[in-house]
Amino acid sequence: MKRIISSILAGLFLTAVPMVQARNLSADEARDAAIHYLQHNTFLERTTANDLVLAHQWTNPTSGEPSMYLFNHTGNGFIIMAATTAMDPIVAYSDNRQLDVERMGESLSWWLDKYNTMVCEVQDYDAAQRSSLVCSEWEALEHHALKGNTKDTRIILMEEEWDQGNNAGTTYNMYSPVVNDTTCPTGCVATALAQICHYYGYPLKAKGTVTASASDGTTLKIRKMQDSAAFNYAIMENHINYSTPIESRREMSRLAYYIGVTVGMSYAPQGSGAVSYTAIGNMNTNFKYQKGSMTYRSTVADSVYLQRLRNELMMNRPCYMGGSSKSGGVHAAGHAWVCCGYRTDNLKMYYMNWGWDGTGNAFYNLGNNNMPIPGMGYNFTEYQEIVTGLIPPQDSTSRDIYAAIPRAEGQVVLGHPYPNPATTSVMLPYSCNHSTVLAVYSIDGRQVATQTLQAGNDEVRLDVSAMPAGIYIYRAGDTYGKFVVR
């Protein structure tokens, strides 16, 4: 009898856990899966094998085999694929820009290094144990089983693409301290927070005298910021290029500089840094931003961490994120960036703004992939944090203006408005499944214009000639955007 019961239990176990062996993938296999994903989840519906060029591959130091593949799309876009079926297929993707690993900022480089370490440990894990980790998503991609296109399920809150001042043609660090005849970069913490401040249009003005410190401990006296020195958000732009007016460059640099020195940046020519916990506290002390709540990923269940992040984004609040490594090297210091988007159909994919002139801004897989595995020495969740509730004070007209805007019906995808800033009119590309109303609001929440979007793929012209200079928010369906009138 005991033997019969044991046989039945063994049969049930084998039925419940199919022993499919996880395997590593060649570049061609990964490319084929990437094509199918891009065709059904992005604006790159017509992607073919000729469109995806292998631009970089990460290598497992133990086995020497590939661990991740980066494919750049010839029509602008990229996708990073895990090189094992034991992991989620998609590491990251963009359908509007390529990725040059030689130009990545340290924050993105750090994040990809951590993710790659996780992939390598899974590849090195005992083969019999690894079989239970086979990701079911691979089956749909390898058998070309996806239907339709889910590009309409993504929401991106921010259009800002600011930088630390390191890249050619950008001058976000015009006011940063000079050390040994070199102007210091603004730093990732200040850049992340400055982009959030620009998103909200707050603080309204600079206050008092502040000092900055150099990384060698030298205290640097900086210019006085008068109470009356209001920030002119109307002339700030989402991105600096060679044609950006000098007045806009100065104002954006002034905001980044003031944010930096008041949150405690330590400036140095090779890189400026600050402690995230202290910086967030100073946002409350100096700017009256509400006290943000910091969640360390390793202290809560992964589902809790991701739900807190998603809840923040669903309230249209860009989320400050940070991370660090536990030992040495270029990544030992902290890193900071902004998470400002998500996919409504995928609880793992989130849009990251790395504060590096738009380089690498894309959707990234934040899922923990059932890690850590018992017995493994690596935990992807360590040394990561998010800050929720970092919003302007309740008496600010900027606070929760996005949440106050009523939702419109219909599935809508809005493109980037152009020109932006504008003086007479703004063109707004869109795609919607049926007739939808686009509403435009001033920064204090007043509706100033509406426009009907007809079903299909088109663009609409918004007349802004009579609108006062300032920041305006538009909404259609669940999608937001922002433009500036001068």
Residue positions per predicted region:
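Bacterial Sec-dependent N-terminal signal peptides
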Residues: 1-27, 283
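C-terminal outer-membrane/trafficking sorting elements
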Residues: 18-19, 407-418, 422-486
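Short, non-transmembrane alpha-helical segments in secretory-pathway proteins
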Residues: 23-59
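Exposed beta-strand-loop-beta-strand "reactive/processing" segments of non-cytosolic proteins
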Residues: 46-85, 94
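Active-site-adjacent substructure of cysteine-protease-like catalytic cores
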Residues: 56-75, 286-353
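Catalytic Cys-His active-site segments of thiol-dependent hydrolases/isopeptidases
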Residues: 82-83, 88-97, 346-366
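Active-site-adjacent structural segments surrounding the nucleophilic cysteine of cysteine proteases
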Residues: 90-272
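Residue-level detector of functionally pivotal "anchor" positions at catalytic/ligand-binding pockets or at interdomain
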Residues: 377-418, 432-433, 446
